[in-house]
Swiss-Prot record:
Job description of the protein: Component of the pyruvate dehydrogenase (PDH) complex, that catalyzes the overall conversion of pyruvate to acetyl-CoA and CO(2).
PANTHER family: PYRUVATE DEHYDROGENASE E1 COMPONENT
Encoding gene per record: aceE
Top-rank taxon: Bacteria
Subunit relationships: Homodimer. Part of the PDH complex, consisting of multiple copies of pyruvate dehydrogenase (E1), dihydrolipoamide acetyltransferase (E2) and lipoamide dehydrogenase (E3).
Protein name per the record: Pyruvate dehydrogenase E1 component
Keyword 4Fe-4S (UniProt): no
EC number: 1.2.4.1
Keyword annotations of the record: Oxidoreductase, Pyruvate, Thiamine pyrophosphate
InterPro entries (UniProt xref): PDC_E1_N (IPR035807), PDH/Transketolase (IPR051157), PDH_E1 (IPR004660), PDH_E1_M (IPR041621), THDP-binding (IPR029061), Transketo_C/PFOR_II (IPR009014), Transketolase-like_C_2 (IPR055152), Transketolase_N (IPR005474)
């Protein structure tokens, strides 16, 4: 900040202005004073437009003054002992794991910087789930997991054997490196690594709690969502990208606590600036309540004595790189290089020893300051709150890591460093014991033991805790309820329309219709879903304060507080985060929701795959509908929109069940089975990805007895009987029609018999094949299991064709009974044109399928190669054209 800002050329005039405002506040109140100040600012802006603007940053001091603080409600002495024991055990856990030389890693410094913050929350704020409400939802910062394990150990929730197996999980008794519900399903609720997903998901989790409450499905009014974040993590676009949504939704049930230890993994976050000020400006500008906790109580007297204002000026001027350096040195260094900058500030500490200067603490390490910030945050109404807590990375670790750039990488500490930590936190471990790296515990009925449990009892129980299954029972629709879709459709429709009809049937089911959550990223009209606007309404926390332009239309844009549709705008990350909050409501709220997020399929896994991977970790249950799928089917939108690979991406997530249906009845069977698996008695921890298309065509009735095949991934659609050779053709989605057309050509022109199979899921077939092979390998003396696809198909030459990359259908090559298997797919970049031209370009139309089948027959000498050559000429195929993968 400029020196000129502090160079008061007329202190008397300044005093007059300040006294005038103080007088207005006393006589007429803050509102009048605020109005007058705003008028002054407006005048200043008019006269100095290019220079003057209101500042979004305040002085580098605490938002809450000492005079406005409440008394601390806890026992500070006992809490310090407990906190010190947790610090120690967290360090011992990592060091003991490191001694095994397994290259396990582990992080020490992040928790040491935030231990006080967490302990204030554990002792006074975190409400556990109880019979009255769902409790608070806490997104713990990923790198501080050892500290949470250490507390759970003192509480008796984790055993010594478990914490001794930190990052050693294969044998089933260890603890995960970071919060992972998949690995610790009764402990962690939310995965918060990779970084950036925690704050994003916390915002939409808070929004979803409001959604449940406003729809009168569940009372969530007392629940708070806490998100603990690092200042370095805030550089992730996801960390800050949705903060305006929290303001728009008035999420006063959301509190961000950002641990501003000024360091990221390699060095300072903003060494040449001030990350706290940067974040304050960003959040304040977005409309958040900002509470800065910069200095601890030991600074209070100095700030009170600072009549010149030079101390606050110095605090404002000092950059983060210097603040970090100060905490890596000692009191004498701080006296000389911080306070020594100005005579006034140097004189402030002239009667203090170097040790007293060194003990001047930062706000995030002061329980009283943190308590008041959290209390103020909980009391804030109609807006979210962010607490910016100034801390020291590696706090208490001394020369080993405190304030050092290497702090994040410290995983081993020599004996002198361990002794320093023991002495720093008064840990009752003798020199004889210290080499054993012992944990410390509290005897049952000791003051500390009783305090830990009594504080948690007051707050309803222990956290983190995760419910792995919902406790109620849902009455789900049976397949017969979708009878209208199992029959031949009177008009040509797309599978997207079939999905909408399935959704409408479910929305008429009185048992579960209130649990349905359609989620859209501003494409409802594209998918033909606008009819739902009036039927179930679009959720809006503010209702609808305007008259919609299309109010007279049947499907007008109807927003309401009890609306069911989550319309997230052009915001795939936000829509997916809402989907994730709803998809885990069965666990977080013991209230299962049945959700369908429909979107352009290419803007799913490709754009937000990290979030869908986290959904797998979080054991999400629900449906993802990849609409307008297929490289050649969304024909006019071109390269960026045409999806030929989302199924390749979805198969990387083990509990994502993927389907590419071709017919309306397949869509109905798949969704009904998904409801049974996810929400029925077995409550499987899976979620579904179903691709649908926007191409209208004839939808036949469901053949008898194909339900099992549809769900497992393949069934025989029909056989066309010829008199010569035999082949098998398999396909999925839009290209199954090309497969059927090719079979007709093979019969008509070559009298070839063709078995046609609809493959609803190449991925599930491949997984089944892999499972069979694994079982057979490990059970050599037992009868081999046979892959499902091998049971269904025969040994005749086989051609597979899909609207996706060849790799999609290549998955099952090893498991089909035929030795001759050729795959056609849409490798390459998409482009705009008619569907016929695109399918010719990507070589997946009926003619290419015929050529592929004839070629396989020629390879086994069933027909002559001349037949293939003639067919290429007959169908006007350019044999020398560039491979579409490269063109």
């Amino acid at each position: 900040m400029s020196e000129n800002l502090y160079n008061d050329v007329d202190p008397i005039e300044t005093r007059d202005w300040v006294q005038a405002i103080e007088s207005v506040i006393r006589r007429e109140g803050h509102k009048r004073a605020h109005f007058l100040i705003e008028q002054v600012l407006k005048t200043a802006k008019i006269n100095r437009k290019e220079f003057f603007r209101s500042s979004f940053t305040s002085d580098y001091i605490n938002t809450i003054s000492r005079e406005d603080e409440y008394e601390y409600p806890g026992n500070l002495i006992l809490e310090k002992r407990i906190r010190s024991a947790i610090r120690w055990n967290a360090i011992m856990m990592v060091l003991r794991a490191s001694k095994k030389n397994l290259e396990l890693g582990g992080h020490l410094s992040s928790f040491q910087s935030s231990a006080t913050i967490y302990e204030v929350c554990f002792n006074h704020f975190f409400q556990a789930k109880n019979h009255k409400d769902g409790g608070d939802l806490v997104y713990f910062q990923g790198h501080i997991s050892p500290g949470i394990y250490a507390r759970s150990f003192l509480e008796g929730r984790l055993s010594e054997e478990q914490i001794d197996n930190f990052r050693q999980e294969v044998d089933g008794i260890g603890l995960s490196s970071y919060p992972h519900p998949k690995l610790m399903p009764n402990f962690w609720q939310f995965p918060t690594v990779s970084m950036g997903l925690g704050p994003l998901c916390a915002i939409y989790q808070a929004k979803f709690l409001k959604y449940l409450h406003n729809r009168e499905l569940k009372n969530t009014s007392k629940q708070i969502v806490y998100a603990f974040l690092g200042d370095g993590e805030m550089d992730e676009p996801e960390s800050k990208g949705a903060i305006s949504i929290a303001v728009r939704e008035k999420l006063d049930n959301l509190i961000f606590i950002i641990n501003c230890n000024l360091q990221r993994l390699d060095g300072p976050v903003v060494g040449n600036g001030k990350i706290v000020n940067e974040l304050e400006s960003f959040f304040y500008g977005a409309g958040w309540k900002v509470i800065k906790v910069i200095w601890g109580s030991r600074w209070d007297c100095l700030l009170k004595k600072d009549t010149s204002g030079k101390l606050i000026q110095l605090m404002n001027e000092t950059v983060d790189g210097d603040y970090q350096t100060f905490k890596s040195k000692d009191g004498a260094y701080v006296r000389k290089y911080f306070f020594g900058k100005y005579k006034e500030t140097y004189d402030l500490v002239k009667d203090m020893t170097d040790e007293e200067i060194w003990k001047l603490n930062r706000g995030g390490h002061d329980p009283k300051k943190m308590f008041n910030a959290l209390k103020k945050a909980k009391e804030t109404k109609y807006k979210p709150t962010v607490i910016l807590a100034h801390t020291v990375k590696g706090y208490g670790m001394g020369v080993i890591a405190e304030g050092k750039n290497i702090a994040h990488q410290i995983k081993k500490i020599n004996i002198n460093g361990i002794i320093h930590i023991r002495d720093r936190f008064n840990i009752p471990v003798s020199n004889d014991e210290i080499n054993k790296l012992p944990y410390v515990t509290f005897k049952k009925n000791s003051e500390e033991y009783c305090y830990i449990h009594s504080q948690r009892k007051k707050l309803g129980g222990y956290i983190p805790f995760r419910l792995s299954s919902f406790t109620g029972k849902l009455i789900l629709p049976k397949l017969i309820d979708f009878q209208s879709l199992l029959e031949e459709q009177k008009k040509d429709i797309s599978t997207t329309v079939a999905f909408i009809r399935v959704l409408n049937i479910i929305l008429k089911n009185n048992s579960i219709k209130h649990l349905i959550v359609p989620i859209i990223a501003d494409e409802a009209r594209t998918f033909g879903m606008e009819g739902l606007f009036r039927k179930i309404g679009i959720y809006s926390s503010s209702g609808q304060k305007y008259t919609p332009q299309d109010r007279e239309q049947l499907a007008y844009y109807k927003e309401e507080k009890k609306g069911q549709i989550l319309q997230e705008g052009i915001n795939e990350l936000g829509a997916a985060s809402s989907w994730l909050a709803a998809a885990t409501s069965y666990s977080t709220n013991d209230f299962p929701m049945i959700l369908f997020y429909i979107y352009y399929s290419i803007f799913g896994f490709q754009r937000i795959g990290d979030l869908f991977w986290a959904a797998g970790d979080q054991q999400a249950r629900g449906f993802l509908i990849g609409g307008t799928s297929g490289r050649t089917t969304l024909n006019g939108e071109g390269l960026q929109h045409e999806d030929g690979h989302s199924h390749i991406q979805s198969l990387t997530i083990p509990n994502c069940i993927s389907y590419d249906p071709a017919f309306a009845y397949e869509v109905a069977v798949i969704i009904q089975d998904g409801l049974r698996r996810m929400y029925g008695p077995s409550q499987e921890n899976i979620y579904y990805y179903i691709t649908t298309i926007n191409e209208n065509y004839y939808m036949p009735a469901m053949p008898i007895g194909v339900e099992e095949g549809i769900c497992k991934g393949i069934y025989k659609l029909k056989t066309l009987h010829g008199t010569t050779s035999k082949v098998q053709l398999i396909g999925s989605g839009a290209i199954l029609r090309s497969v059927c057309e090719a079979a007709e050509i093979l019969l008509k022109d070559y009298s070839i018999t063709t078995d046609i199979y609809s493959v609803t899921s190449f991925t599930e077939l491949a997984r089944n094949g892999e499972d069979c092979e694994r079982w057979n390998m490990l059970h050599p003396n037992e009868k081999n299991k046979i892959a499902y696809v091998k049971q269904i198909m025969n040994k005749n030459p086989t051609v597979a064709a899909t609207d996706y990359m060849k790799l999609f259908a290549e998955q099952i090559r090893h498991y089909i009974p035929s030795q001759e298997y050729h795959v056609l797919g849409t490798d390459g970049f998409g482009r705009s044109d008619s569907r016929d031209k695109l399918r010719d370009h990507f070589e997946v139309n009926a003619y290419y399928i015929v050529i592929a089948a004839l070629n396989l027959l020629a390879n086994i000498n069933d027909i002559k190669k001349k037949v293939v050559e003639d067919a290429i000429m007959k169908f006007n195929i350019d044999a020398n054209k560039i491979n579409p993968r490269l063109s």
